[in-house]
Amino acid sequence: MKMADGSTILRRNRPGTKSKDFCRWPDEPLEEMDSTLAVQQYIQQLIKRDPSNVELILTMPEAQDEGVWKYEHLRQFCMELNGLAVRLQKECSPSTCTQMTATDQWIFLCAAHKTPKECPAIDYTRHTLDGAACLLNSNKYFPSRVSIKESSVTKLGSVCRRVYRIFSHAYFHHRRIFDEFEAETYLCHRFTHFVTKYNLMSKENLIVPINVGENAAPGESEA
Amino acid sequence: MGTNSGATAGINNKPVGGAGGAGVLGGGGVGGANSSIGGVLSNSLGGGGSGGLSISGLNAGGQNANVGGLIGVGGMGNVGGDDGGNGMVGGGPNNQQATTPQYTIPGILHFIQHEWSRFELERSQWDVDRAELQARIAMLLGERKCLESLKSDLTRRIKMLEYALRQERAKFYRLKYGTDPPQLNEFKPSNEDAGLAGEVATDSEVPYSSVSNTTWRQGRQMLRQYLAEIGYTDNIIDVRSNRVRSILGLNNNAEHDGSGGGLGGGLGSGTGGENLSPNINGNESNKRASETEGRHTPAKKVQQSIDEIIVDTEAAVMANFEFLGATEMSDDDEISDDLEMVATDNDDTDVKMAKRAKSGKDMLTEDLEADVGEQLLNDMNLMTEEVDGSLGLGELAQLTVNNESDGAYDANSKDGSGGSAGGAGYRKTWNAKYTLRSHFDGVRSLIFHPEEPVLITASEDHTLKLWNLQKTVQAKKSASLDVEPLYTFRAHTGPVLCLGMSSSGETCYSGGLDGNIECWQLPSPNIDPYDCYDPNVHSGTLEGHTDAVWGLTTMQSNIVSCSADGTVKLWSPYNKEPLLRTYTASEAEGAPSSVDFVRNEVDHIVVAYNSAHCIVYDTETGKQVVRLEAAQEMSGNTGKFINKVVSHPTLPITITAHEDRHIRFWDNTSGTLVHSMVAHLEPVTSLAVDAHGLYLLSGSHDCSIRLWNLDNKTCVQEITAHRKKFDESIFDVAFHATKPYIASAGADGLAKVFV
């Protein structure tokens, strides 16, 4: 976006940038990114370009460490889920949703506490996101964003399972919010596809009816 | 009862008859508080003069006329002629007072009481004035004496160095020719020596003043304690030093020779305004001055105290000092205990320096370092360099550097004593202590609580987080000095770009890419991170901007924000109509990029625009007050883009951080560029000034933060703090207002706190 001098492209959001110009700069090929945050940059760049192109966003570049790839994607999911939480805050109150439920089948207990607790849905949402933020930024489990320990990669699955419940709660209890949010971000789409692709959650847990097959079909031909 | 009767009598506001007039005149004089009363009284006396009345000080008739008017009592007019001094209430009609109003005794009493209290008030005011002036005289006297004693101190040092040099030369001579040099023990240096000594003195002028700075710093701190004891609080001292700083600020950056040249200049710029504080303490400085003067006058006595120490410690050294002769031990008795402390301290240094000089074939910095205190060490280092400098006659550049850092120490120690910031006060090196990791994306802004060790960060991940540095949540998922956030503020639907906090620390405001400003009530800093959701934390949204809000700053209950929609808005967040005013510049200026309140001028804000100009607005009138621009400097302003503007907390100075790697300083009154410096390797993105206005912190996309001494605009410390994401690195820096914390926020999603 910012052309400073000659051919150098400086990818900066200077103060005063209009919101439509935020992060609007020419894509940078992953191989040219020399930052330790290259994967995040790359993923965000793809999402910025077209959030609906879930398949492309989830296509792992060659020679990419899969652990890092999954980790950075999960960070991005949790980050974008803040948007859903903001919307839910307005509507989902402890009086209307006293428990974290999706279908009537399960009541989810909040794992953020010493002993799992039956938090109201909004608290569950916030605690889960806060806990995920702490875990994914933990110096102990994820000290580096360039390489991830194998033991830590296993943590990603449980984070996925927990944050997925936010989608499912929104879908079953706050459908309008869910639909609006999904139309903008394709986040549940992308998430479902992500966990399926990397086998982070079992299929029977994916209760939000997203037609993965439809989106996945062209993807599978590539992959 | 004289007054009473007088009052009763004193109802005539004009002297009656010729005799009366004479009486009035006879008593004429200025009697302070009583004079007017006297005037009133005496009027009644008529021909009798002032015989019966004790109060005879008179004012002019005109004032009496006033009095009559005030009293407003009629019919009591007194022809006091016959009554003489009795002060009897004359019932007779007063033909000259046809218009005189009725007088009543209570009315008169009331009047007199009133007048009395008024005079009392005036008198006490006068007393206060007098005390102030006296204090000022004492101050100025002390100031003079300080300078005198400084001069003598310097002279003493020069003598010492001359001596050291002679010793060196002698040694050199011995080593080279194997014989004692001629004239070794003569006190009067040979012509050659004299010439060299002179040379040394001139060459080392700068280091001399810096050494004395160190000495003065000790003395100053001590005097500051005395002052505190006698009730001169830091505030008063600060006011004075601020004044001096502002004076110095005018000939900004003039460094040593600029502000008065030579000795005075060194004193002024090196040690700031604090030199003045000792002066208040008359006694001490008197004693000290007389003492030093006593030493000073006979040149030989300069070394007397050194000799005294030497007697105690090293006879050999003493032998070397013999030529300095006369040790007047009796002088010491005159020195008060407190001063002895100071003196001993200094002398100690001097002796060490003397030893050094004596054995100083080479640079002997290391071996002595072990056994001397830090402060002394500092002295010594400077001293060594002096010696070396004078011997080698060079290295001035190095000395300058040292001077600068010396100034930094100075300001630092001042900072330590001024704020609650602890610290032994000497060199403060900031070290990263806390890493705040919990954001998923770049941290755009951070702000400290005004009192608590608490801060808030705002990130591109759409959230704000609250951190308590005292609650390093050791638990489950974090390593040692990581801090876990206590609370996550969610309301923005896009990246959060800027933060502000109320002066009470109860409320904070955040501006986002979504164009909204959210208002938050801070949860308790001891909240459980996984507590229930309290919707009241989010206490409102200020809607009005139609594009990203990039700048936000607070002053008392108001906040001012700037947005990519081209406007700057002033808000009073909890009003019914929160938006107070909108300021819009011409199209040519582009969008505002940053905004700050002008801290030393109420109702002024300074706004930086894309055009690389700053404009100061009056918030009340909405008028442009001054435009900060420098034609030649800013010509072709592409790339000079301003990333951040801050106002100096006490001086009329605006500081701007530029895309072209510069930090620039502007004079708010004239709108001119005061100083410009290349500060970083890449664009400067953020600035913060500490609460005392002594230090500037800057952050840049070159991944480093730098701490600057505002006095001499030198970099005190550089810390590499963050990593790059795209071409961005550091977004914000901050000072804690009352605690020794600084912090930086980076594009890598981390915030760091340094102590």
From Swiss-Prot, chain A:
Keyword entries, A-Z: Metal-binding, Zinc
Domain of life: Eukaryota
The keyword Metal-binding is assigned to this record: yes
Biological processes, Gene Ontology terms: axo-dendritic transport; cellular response to nutrient; microtubule cytoskeleton organization; negative regulation of hippo signaling; negative regulation of synaptic assembly at neuromuscular junction; neuron projection morphogenesis; positive regulation of insulin receptor signaling pathway; positive regulation of neuroblast proliferation
Assigned GO CC terms: cytoplasm; cytosol; FAR/SIN/STRIPAK complex; terminal bouton
Positions of the UniProt region annotated as Disordered: 1-21
InterPro entries: MOB_kinase_act_fam, MOB_kinase_act_sf
Matching Pfam families: Mob1_phocein
GO function terms (MF aspect): metal ion binding
SUPFAM superfamilies, per the entry: Mob1/phocein
Binding, Zn(2+): C92, C97, H169, H174
Stored SMART domains: Mob1_phocein (SM01388)
UniProt key word Cytoplasm: no
Protein family per UniProt: Belongs to the MOB1/phocein family.
Protein name, entry field: MOB kinase activator-like 4
Organism: Drosophila melanogaster (Fruit fly)
